[in-house]
């Protein structure tokens, strides 16, 4: 049996293949107010260069309060605002009264909240494994710093491990693919 085991209090992940630990890496987990849930699931797919649709909790607790003070928050964070017709709305047209009527999307890139890669699995918490734009966090001893998702220290190596397809998806190809900022869904 092959599986990933995340030890939340130890801030670590191990990959187990046929009973042997084949990979170990540091992770960042949810902070005290937005803890990473304990769950068991099966990986459904891997996204290279993913867009990030900002979840309601992060909008309400982080984005909206900052945007009220400074509309340029959307531009600084490279967030696009879309109405229900999928038309882009200017940050200067944005009003807090209408804030929940819109979708907020961060385009892919090394500095996006999801970084270069996201691993999806079914769960009721809307959490996943992903890269990060805060790579410096892995130097810290205390790493309960995310909004619930698990951030990976070596995300592209984990993608290679999960894909297990050296012929079609070696690490070099995964790295090259993330350099072009083109969204790709795998597996």
Predicted regions span which residues?
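Well-ordered beta-sheet/strand-loop patches within structured domains
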Residues: 1-187
């Amino acid at each position: 049996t092959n599986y990933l085991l995340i030890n939340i209090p130890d801030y670590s992940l191990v990959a187990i293949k046929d009973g042997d630990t084949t990979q170990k890496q540091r992770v960042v987990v949810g902070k005290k107010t937005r803890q990473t849930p304990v769950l068991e699931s099966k990986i459904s797919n891997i996204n290279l260069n993913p867009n990030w649709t900002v979840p309601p909790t992060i909008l309400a607790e982080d984005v909206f309060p900052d945007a009220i003070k400074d509309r340029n928050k959307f531009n600084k964070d490279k967030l696009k605002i879309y109405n229900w017709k999928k038309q882009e709305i200017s940050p200067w047209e944005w009003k807090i009264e209408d804030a929940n009527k819109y979708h907020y999307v961060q385009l892919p890139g090394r500095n996006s909240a999801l970084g270069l890669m996201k691993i999806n699995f079914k769960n009721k918490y809307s959490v996943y494994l992903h890269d990060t734009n805060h790579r410096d966090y892995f130097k810290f001893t205390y790493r309960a710093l995310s909004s619930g998702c698990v951030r990976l220290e070596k995300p592209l190596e984990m993608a290679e491990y999960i894909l297990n397809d050296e012929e079609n998806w070696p690490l070099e190809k995964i790295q090259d693919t993330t350099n072009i900022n083109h969204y790709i869904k795998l597996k």
